Amino acid sequence: SLGSVLYNYKTTRKVNLKMMLEHTKSVRMGVKKSLLVIDLPYNTYRNKSEALKNSKRALKETNCDAVKVEGGVRVKDVVSHLVKNKIPVLGHIGLTPQTVKGKFKSVGRTDRERKRLIRDAKALEQSGAFGMVLECVYSDISKKITKLIRIPTIGIGASVHCDGQVLVTDDILG
């Protein structure tokens, strides 16, 4: 959301780690009791060592509580490595803004998409993620995933069936 909401970028890929660190530091000044998760930007977790280096830096410099990475099966080894190194990880599946090609659209309409979402959700859970964001996932598959896994699901346009919801103030106010 940082790139699109605050900078009016057409893609989140323009957001870099330095930008995320500065904004997360600012948020930390106001957030005292809530869990604060930093979104690792595109190309900052391409492999385990890069992910660990950038995650450690993010936690140290911002005093945030966890990192968020996009992807399921394709990032499971990175997630496992971070968790083994005591970095709490929030996963993110469904519509993944860092890798979306073309227009944003809901995910989980076809059997193939549904099966991929379930595989991704299970992979994140098995890798040790403490929760996952489901973005723009059809209601029935969000409900199925939420019942299937034991970690919390947080929906962004993914129905009332998730355990929690993300509400972007700028989206609400227009």
Language-model segment annotations:
Residues S1-G174:
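Alpha/beta enzyme core
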